[in-house]
A protein has these predicted regions:
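Noncatalytic, beta-rich nucleic-acid-contacting surfaces in large DNA/RNA-processing enzymes
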Residues: 1-273
Length: 276
């Protein structure tokens, strides 16, 4: 369901950014910074950088990705530092998009061989992200990517522990074919009517399907082994917790863990809060 493998990665897992990754094909860290900057700007990617890349005019490394790059690029071209800074500030605040370049700016850029596509790209931008923020976001994403690649079971266990409220138990234990069938059903419902609940369920199913397709398995709920709300790695697989059952609340799931895993006496339904 994805060409990027970035499901579950902050800043990189949304439909919008996954589409950017497919279009731009970043190959190194600096190009991923470009993706981070482009995804947080306004009118920086859509109808701007995406068209430049698609037409072959320039690459992901060359488009305007972060606000800082405008000033640095213009300085390399030989513009006066004050003018380079002022142009950057005007572009990143959307002032150029709204009212055009100040007198003399465009002429100076052309005199210093700034290409037409770059000047026109500046005209479209309404907001630009600072490079420092883009790097900070990307560093967090890279750390999680590393775990997803080299410690996948741990990654999925932690992901679902933190964001597993909408997990589909039947899909998790049923295998990739069941997960895909459930995904298709949710997508069908979303085409008919958008709603936040189904969108969250779809994200969860995408992670479930990805994990299964990669060859990793979920273990079903088992008394004495499952936790209340924590997914745990067991023999290279991910053990589902009690809370993965629909309708079983957190308090009841924790009570079941205490009763079955920690040796507490399992007396009656009331002690597990299952009848609350």
């Amino acid at each position: 369901d994805s060409q990027t493998g970035t499901f579950g990665i902050p800043e990189m897992g949304t439909n919008f950014v996954r589409g950017m990754l497919v279009e731009a094909r970043p190959k190194n860290f600096s190009e991923l910074i470009q993706i981070s900057g482009l995804s947080h700007g306004t009118d920086v990617w859509t109808g701007n950088a995406d068209e430049l890349i698609r037409s072959g005019t320039c690459t992901i490394a060359e488009v305007i990705g972060c606000r800082d790059s405008i000033m640095l690029y213009l300085l390399r071209k030989g513009l006066e530092p004050k003018m380079a800074f002022d142009i950057m500030e005007a572009v990143r605040k959307g002032k150029v998009a709204k009212g055009g370049f100040a007198p003399g700016w465009e002429e100076a850029m052309r005199e210093h061989d700034v290409p037409d596509w770059y000047i026109e790209s500046c005209r479209k931008i309404k907001y630009m992200f600072p490079k420092a923020h883009a790097v900070a976001y990307l560093m967090s994403a890279i750390r999680l990517m590393w775990f997803k690649l080299y410690h996948p079971q741990a990654f999925y266990a932690v992901y679902f522990t933190v964001r597993g409220d909408d997990i589909d138990y039947e899909a998790a234990v049923g295998g990739a074919a069941v997960a895909r069938a459930h995904m298709n059903e949710v997508k069908r419902r979303l085409k008919e009517e958008k709603n936040a609940k189904d969108e969250d369920v779809l994200v969860s199913l995408q992670l479930v399907n990805e994990m299964l397709v990669r060859g990793y398995e979920f273990l079903p709920i088992e008394l004495g082994k499952s936790r209340g709300s924590k997914y745990v790695v067991e023999d290279g697989k991910v053990r589902l917790p009690f809370c993965s059952l629909k309708g079983l609340g957190g308090a009841a799931a924790d009570a079941l863990e205490n009763a079955t895993l920690h040796g507490q006496e399992y007396q009656d339904r009331k002690s597990t809060r299952l009848n609350s």
